[in-house]
Amino acid sequence: MDQDACTHSAALILAAGKGTRMCSNKPKVLHTLLGEPLLFHVISALRPLFGSNIWVVIGHGSSLIQSICSDLSLNFIYQEKQLGTANAVSIALPVLQQSRIKRLMVINGDMPLITSDLLECIIKKSDKTDFVFATLKLPLPNDYGRILRREGKIYSIIEAKDIEPSLQHDTTVEVNAGLYYFSLEVVDKCLPMIKNENKSQEYYFTDIIELAVENGYLVDSIYFEEDWHFLGVNTPKDLSYVESIQQAFIIEKLLQSGVIIHSPESVRISPFATIEPGVEIYGPCEIYGASYIASGSIIYSHSWIKNTTISHDVCIYSFCHLDTVIIKDKCSIGPYARLRPGCHLEEQVCIGNFVEIKKTQLGKHVKINHLSYIGDAIVGDESNIGAGTITCNYDGENKHHTFIGKKAFIGSNTALVAPLTIGEKSLIGAGSVIIRDVPENMVSIARGKQKNFSKRK
């Protein structure tokens, strides 16, 4: 889409519904698919085509939706009463007109398998029409609205609840996919004519098709053979099914690109993750968010990774939990390690079993091999942190920082009470509780004097 078209076109996501059949108080569009809300998947498909011209109609759980989407540069429109899809569009219309939008795409917020390429096909189809929408042919139409044609031309859509009994058992019929792109002029004229004279007593946006045809507008459709792109989520079963389709597609694409995946049926990978050819993954494993894994790295089973950048030749052993971390080349993590948000590991860092790290920078060749907690710290190159080392970073009110210089050696079972600085090449004796700064090249021991007593006979 060219810049001018992008400026005067917009997308409207319908996300105000309660999603009653999900049996949850959470807004339906916030239920997650492969670690991300359904709404995020739709936004991801729209963003390359519409930029910041994306409006979301919200109602149930509106404050929660706005909070979770606060960093996404979206425009929100509140629908107080959910009176139907036409009502949602009518509420948005004045805002869109004020923003000088000329063409609008309307899409449901629960269609996570939609793609930018597919949306672009619909936009291109609209060049010679006033209103275009997507259709499918399904052997079991279920809840989909039926397309009615007269002499081959579309003239109406009938929603599933209002279909005559004689048509209920039709085999393989053309249905509405729930995706529209049109001139705002059509909506401005025809939307006020829509009535709620149907079994649901709702204002159906699909009624605009018949009204547009009657008023002389050019209405057309684009048929898609692959119906799975348009699958919506209405129930927990739907969510599970859609997720399985998305996962199978992602796994197949990665396998073809050269990623080695053992037990692929037990591996879950976000569509927003990037994994280079030459990576090896053992299932079960979960990789979410905008994670990036470079070639040569190995991810062993039962690892959970989110929004993490893993460079070349890194080994993540089993049962590791990595959240928003940067890991440079040739590091070794785990097993049973937890790296929390804000960690940055330079090249060839070794993190062993039962180690937790939070908001910490580790220099090159740092070793933390066993049973330690390092939080709010900076550790210099080639330092060694002994087993059982704890940075005592919280005083009950505030967090404090620990600075450990290059080539320092921290003995086992040491408590470092922050704020604290350990100088370069210093050595801390095992079992110490360090409460004051230690200068460079010093040995510091802070523990009780050992006393031996004879055993009683």
From Swiss-Prot:
Q: Where are the transmembrane segments?
A: none
Q: How is the cofactor bound?
A: Binds 1 Mg(2+) ion per subunit.
User: What Enzyme Commission number(s) does the record list for this chain?
Assistant: 2.7.7.23, 2.3.1.157
Which principal EC class is assigned to this enzyme? transferase
Query: Which positions are annotated as binding Mg(2+)?
Result: 110, 234
Q: In which pathway does it act?
A: Nucleotide-sugar biosynthesis; UDP-N-acetyl-alpha-D-glucosamine biosynthesis; N-acetyl-alpha-D-glucosamine 1-phosphate from alpha-D-glucosamine 6-phosphate (route II): step 2/2; Nucleotide-sugar biosynthesis; UDP-N-acetyl-alpha-D-glucosamine biosynthesis; UDP-N-acetyl-alpha-D-glucosamine from N-acetyl-alpha-D-glucosamine 1-phosphate: step 1/1; Bacterial outer membrane biogenesis; LPS lipid A biosynthesis
Chain positions recorded as acetyl-CoA binding sites: 387, 393-394, 412, 430, 447
Please give the Gene Ontology molecular function terms for this protein: glucosamine-1-phosphate N-acetyltransferase activity; magnesium ion binding; UDP-N-acetylglucosamine diphosphorylase activity
Signal peptide region: none
Linker: annotated segments: 237-257
According to its UniProt entry, the function of this protein is described as: Catalyzes the last two sequential reactions in the de novo biosynthetic pathway for UDP-N-acetylglucosamine (UDP-GlcNAc). The C-terminal domain catalyzes the transfer of acetyl group from acetyl coenzyme A to glucosamine-1-phosphate (GlcN-1-P) to produce N-acetylglucosamine-1-phosphate (GlcNAc-1-P), which is converted into UDP-GlcNAc by the transfer of uridine 5-monophosphate (from uridine 5-triphosphate), a reaction catalyzed by the N-terminal domain.
Q: Name the family the entry cites.
A: In the N-terminal section; belongs to the N-acetylglucosamine-1-phosphate uridyltransferase family. In the C-terminal section; belongs to the transferase hexapeptide repeat family.
Name of the protein in question: Bifunctional protein GlmU
Q: Which organism is it from?
A: Lawsonia intracellularis (strain PHE/MN1-00)
Gene name, please?
glmU
